[in-house]
């Protein structure tokens, strides 16, 4: 009897790991940084509210993060005339936490004199929420 219960529990634990967590629609806050390895100027967007975006329920990761950095990169190429930039996004569910990170990024680069950070005008660039589609995993 104990062997049967142990077997059932073992099978339950093994299949639980194979099930993917469903994404949750959440409000998050986000900003982006665009920098080039060949230039000393980097651009930083304002902190923006994103509603809704999809968050991985187990890890808290933002689905399709690369799409948002691609949006910023496309903007930098087409509107700002700055090709070949590397774009990074930062996000948080809490606005205060992200604003703190925003200030740390600016302070870090000013302190090191590594990049001249230029803040984009409010509303110059807007992230567009992406519709989540389930990706097939192998």
Regions found by a protein language model. Name each.
Residues 2-4, 60-63, 90:
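N-terminal start-of-chain detector that recognizes signal peptides
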Residues 11-12, 67-70, 95-97, 106:
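A short linear-motif detector with a strong N-terminal bias
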Residues 81-138:
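Surface-exposed, polar helix/loop patches in the mature regions of secreted/periplasmic/lumenal proteins
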């Amino acid at each position: 009897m104990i062997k049967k219960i142990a077997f059932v529990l073992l099978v339950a634990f093994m299949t639980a790991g194979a099930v993917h967590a469903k994404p949750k629609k959440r409000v998050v806050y986000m900003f982006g940084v665009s920098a080039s390895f060949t230039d000393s100027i980097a651009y930083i967007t304002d902190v923006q509210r994103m509603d809704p975006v999809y968050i991985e329920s187990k890890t808290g990761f933002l689905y399709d993060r690369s799409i948002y950095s691609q949006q910023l990169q496309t903007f930098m190429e087409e509107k700002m005339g700055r090709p070949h930039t590397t774009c990074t996004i930062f996000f948080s569910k809490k606005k205060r936490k992200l604003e703190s990170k925003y200030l740390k990024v600016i302070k870090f680069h000013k302190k090191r004199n590594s990049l001249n950070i230029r803040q984009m005008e409010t509303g110059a660039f807007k992230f567009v929420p992406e519709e989540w589609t389930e990706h097939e995993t192998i």
